[in-house]
Regions:
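AAA+ P-loop NTPase catalytic core and its hallmark functional loops
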Residues: 35-202
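Contiguous surface segments at macromolecular interaction interfaces
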Residues: 3-49
Length: 202
């Protein structure tokens, strides 16, 4: 019951066929990402403010306040005791602002004590032939948002208090602020410049 409404699963159907008195399993082994792609192409589920208020224990006034703050500041922190549904509410807040359940415009990560700039922005990762400069999850998501300026994107960080913000964000810590969106900074591991797009909300 605790997982109701939180997980979406695509079950693999298993059928059996009788042959020479033996049962041979006929198993659909299509990769999960194929199902995910089919679902994203064939089913667009609308999601409204009313849907949010029906799923999240929050008043309409509080919802309107959250929306106004997020649109104005670009960044929003939800604070509360563990297990009260902050992450659940954050994702559905994003859904309601997008207007549909479009997970391609939402990214979710969880910070921990060992999370680093190399994981988040950019860094060298071990490969078979040595080390390779690899883009982190925040960098990639920002690039996606920058390529589609007509759409809003939402980056959700769970357990943000467990991470070392200065260590993880590095020179980009200031760039997530509203007044510095679009301002370019040179990345530590490359000579390229980078900015946090204005259509990305955190």
């Amino acid at each position: 019951d605790e997982l109701a409404g939180k997980l979406t699963a695509k079950w693999i159907k298993i059928k059996t066929a009788e042959r020479e008195h033996r049962y041979v399993p006929d198993i659909d082994l299509s990769p999960y990402y194929v199902y995910r792609e089919e679902e994203s192409q064939n089913s667009v589920v609308p999601y409204t403010k009313e849907d949010f208020l029906g799923e999240v224990y929050m008043s309409e006034e509080s919802y309107d306040t959250l929306v106004a703050l997020l649109k104005n500041k670009k960044n929003l922190i939800l604070q509360g005791a563990p297990g009260v549904g902050k992450t659940f509410a954050a994702k559905r807040l994003a859904y309601s602002l997008i207007g549909e359940k479009d997970d391609s415009r939402i990214e979710f990560i969880q910070f921990h004590q060992n999370y680093s700039y190399e994981d988040f922005i950019m860094g060298y990762k071990p490969q078979e032939q040595g080390f390779k400069l690899t883009n982190g999850i925040f960098y990639r998501f920002c690039m996606t948002a920058a390529d589609h300026p007509e759409k809003d994107y939402y980056f959700i960080i769970d357990e943000i208090n467990r991470g070392n913000m200065s260590k993880i964000f590095g020179e980009l810590l200031m760039l997530i602020e509203k007044d510095y969106r679009g301002t370019k900074a040179t990345l530590a591991y490359s000579s390229t410049t980078f900015s946090v797009p204005k259509n990305l909300y955190m």
